[in-house]
Curated annotation (Swiss-Prot):
SUPFAM superfamilies: Interleukin 8-like chemokines
Xref: InterPro entries: Chemokine_b/g/d, Chemokine_CC_CS, Chemokine_IL8-like_dom, Interleukin_8-like_sf
Function: May play a role in the trafficking of activated/effector T-lymphocytes to inflammatory sites and other aspects of activated T-lymphocyte physiology. Chemotactic for monocytes, dendritic cells and natural killer cells. Mild chemoattractant for primary activated T-lymphocytes and a potent chemoattractant for chronically activated T-lymphocytes but has no chemoattractant activity for neutrophils, eosinophils, and resting T-lymphocytes. Binds to CCR4. Processed forms MDC(3-69), MDC(5-69) and MDC(7-69) seem not be active.
Gene: CCL22
Name the record gives this protein: C-C motif chemokine 22
Organism name: Homo sapiens (Human)
Modification(s) after translation: The N-terminal processed forms MDC(3-69), MDC(5-69) and MDC(7-69) are produced by proteolytic cleavage after secretion from monocyte derived dendrocytes.
CDD domains: Chemokine_CC (cd00272)
Species classification: Eukaryota, Metazoa, Chordata, Craniata, Vertebrata
GO BP terms in the entry: antimicrobial humoral immune response mediated by antimicrobial peptide; cell-cell signaling; chemokine-mediated signaling pathway; chemotaxis; eosinophil chemotaxis; immune response; inflammatory response; positive regulation of cell migration
Keywords: Chemotaxis, Cytokine, Disulfide bond, Secreted, Signal
Subcellular location(s) per record: Secreted
Length: 93
């Protein structure tokens, strides 16, 4: 029984890590005007969950786009990745 519980715990921890989203947030010297992405989401988001997007500040050290979901989560994504480009194109139409 202990092995089953341990295996279940390991699976749940791995699932939590895999589903972890990188949320957008301000950081840096001028936190009021800049939103930067420290990291990008590691999994593909389906278009149906994204309602809006906005670009991160030009003062950020790396390019980023923040995808706003229908559940009002702000998720950082790499604008150079093909699936992100597709979402940006669809939402810009």
């Amino acid at each position: 029984m202990d092995r089953l519980q341990t295996a279940l715990l390991v699976v749940l921890v791995l699932l939590a890590v895999a589903l972890q989203a990188t949320e957008a947030g301000p950081y840096g010297a001028n936190m009021e005007d800049s939103v930067c992405c420290r990291d990008y989401v590691r999994y593909r988001l389906p278009l149906r969950v994204v309602k809006h997007f906005y670009w991160t500040s030009d003062s950020c050290p790396r390019p980023g786009v923040v995808l706003l979901t229908f559940r009002d989560k702000e998720i950082c994504a790499d604008p150079r990745v093909p699936w992100v480009k597709m979402i940006l194109n669809k939402l810009s139409q």
